[in-house]
Regions:
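Non-catalytic cap/lid and distal C-terminal segments of serine-dependent acyl enzymes
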Residues: 1-253
Length: 253
């Protein structure tokens, strides 16, 4: 079942739309359903996963719910211009959905987060910022290092999202936006991190940073699955590997 929600968000201060896939049947014993909070990329919106992939079919096979918000071009940040997209996708939206759908639970084991490209970054950021909220995480072609100088995005977009005084992405190193720093911090504090599935294509310009993040997680002893294979930065491969990620984390279907 596909539902389209439209509501006024306090965090992003405007009307927003969210697509929600619900299992066709509820558990007769009242067991909550597993929910995948699924994020789009820089050039996408809440409709992207529905339009470009078979996510509805894959959700049905795994008997899970999927929630797909619209995060604009925010890089899933609480932005400098006042739209708190990170708080929206990690706090406000889950709370709203749990009030709306009785089968949703805040318990960690019922929640996964995933995304592609910018959304892969957002998903890993959510998993590392709130590891107590998510049992697992999926990143496909994730733009996992936002501190690089050679960003494809212009600096003005960076400033509007991360700080108007920002002169270089390098200034974000070591902050709450830096996934490498977040991973190290969590491990130093002994926190249990979500099991993570990472995929990137061999023809993708983001391959080196994905390899570096995999190497970091390996050195830290973080439970994760890393795969790289033929593919570029396109939906053909994201559609294929969202299936791989779900099968890895939830079991083959």
């Amino acid at each position: 079942m596909l539902l389209k929600l439209s509501f006024q968000s306090k965090e992003i201060k405007k009307m927003t739309q969210v697509n929600v896939i619900l299992p066709d049947e509820t558990d007769p014993a009242g067991e909550p359903c597993t929910v995948l909070w699924l994020f789009h990329g820089l050039h996408g919106d809440h409709n992207s996963w529905m339009q470009e992939s078979g996510i509805k079919k894959y959700a049905k096979a795994h008997r899970i719910a999927v929630v797909m918000p619209d995060a604009d071009r925010s890089w899933y940040a609480d932005t400098a211009y006042g739209a708190n997209y990170f708080s929206f996708v990690t706090k406000e939206l889950p709370e709203l959905c749990r009030k709306t759908f009785s089968s949703f639970s805040a318990e960690r084991k019922y929640n996964l987060v995933g995304g592609l490209s910018m959304g892969g970054y957002g998903a890993v950021k959510a998993a590392l910022t709130y590891p107590e909220q998510y049992a697992a995480c999926i990143s496909l072609s994730g733009s996992l290092d936002i501190t690089r100088k050679n960003r494809a995005c212009d600096l003005e977009l960076w400033k509007s999202n991360f700080g108007f005084d920002l002169q270089s992405p390098l200034e974000l190193e070591g902050t709450a936006h830096d996934l490498f720093a977040l991973a190290r911090k969590n491990c130093e504090e002994g926190k249990a991190l979500p099991k993570t599935y990472i995929w990137c294509g061999l023809e993708d310009s983001l391959l080196p940073v994905n390899q570096e993040f995999h190497q970091l997680l390996t050195s830290l002893g973080v439970d994760h699955t890393y795969e790289e294979s033929t593919g570029n930065h396109s939906w053909k491969w994201w559609d294929l590997h969202i299936q791989s990620g779900l099968n890895c984390l939830l079991g083959e279907k």
